[in-house]
Structures are given as structure tokens and as C-alpha cells.
Amino acid sequence: MDKNKINELKQHYPKDTRVVLIYMDDEQAPPIGTKGTVIGVDDIGSLLVRWDNGSRLNVLYGIDKVEKIVEK
């Protein structure tokens, strides 16, 4: 992944952004609907998330899916 796309991800998902899991391709994935807090974006574009259930699995760009939680 190029640096421009990684920077876009960092802008779209800044540290402390709340997200909800829509899909994760991993047998040990948190349940769909689990919420978490973004703690960063790594050099390959994976979202580093601290899931509310204690999981630390990363969200893989182009494979897994999360949505930002927009506070109203």
C-alpha cells in the first residue's frame, strides 16, 4: 500500500476513533457488532484496534470491514 493511502486511512481513522466491526475474516474475530477504539494505523494500512471485549486483532485493509461510530 502506498504512503498516500496510509495517510488517508490515518486521517479517516485518527487515534481514539470509535468503530464497530462489520466483518472480519478470522476464526478468532470478535463478534460482528463489537465496538472498539482505533489506536493507530500500521505501515501496511491495518487498523490497530483495542476491541471492547479485550481482543487486539487488527482490521486488515481490503479484507475486513469496520464503520466509524458517529456521535450525535
Predicted regions located by residue number:
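Basic/aromatic-rich interaction segments and small domains that mediate binding to polyanionic partners
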Residues: M1-K72
